[in-house]
Amino acid sequence: MTCTLRLTVAALVLLGICHLSRPVAAYQKCARYWYCWLPYDIERDRYDDGYRLCCYCRNAWTPWQCREDEQFERLRCGSRYYTLCCYTEDDNGNGNGNGNGYGNGNGNGNGNNYLKYLFGGNGNGNGEFWEEYIDERYDK
């Protein structure tokens, strides 16, 4: 009995360590969109200097359901997979995005602008693109 108890305790400890050591994704609801902060966000954000972007997403079955300002994504949150249409709030002008050291937050977006990289759009360094976009989208 003692041996079985020891094995059970050891197994539970190992399971606990494995559970705690796996990457944890945080789910939050933002307006009518869901977004998920992955442990290292989306693969394309690997140059974002550790700043986690807010990626606003909605469920979609196919890329054709996404609007022109959205990107079709297949994201993993924990053990679940989602197919989504997503856009990001970050225009990468202030160096907190994937910035690569360009732009100081005051000038125009550059060739490595995050939105331009994703969607061919142009923002400027102080985030006006998304401020105007979000105002236009939600304040009507």
Swiss-Prot record:
Transmembrane segments: none annotated. Coiled coil: none annotated. The lineage of its organism: Eukaryota, Metazoa, Spiralia, Lophotrochozoa, Mollusca. Its main location: secreted. This is Perlin matrix protein. GO terms for cellular component: extracellular region. Residues 1-26 form the signal peptide. It comes from the Eukaryota. May be specifically involved in the formation of the nacreous layer. Belongs to the N16 matrix protein family. The keyword Signal applies. Component of conchiolin, the organic matrix of nacre. Only expressed in the dorsal region of the mantle. The keyword Secreted applies. Keywords: Disulfide bond, Extracellular matrix, Secreted, Signal. Heterooligomer; disulfide-linked. Pif97, Pif80, N16 and other proteins form a complex.
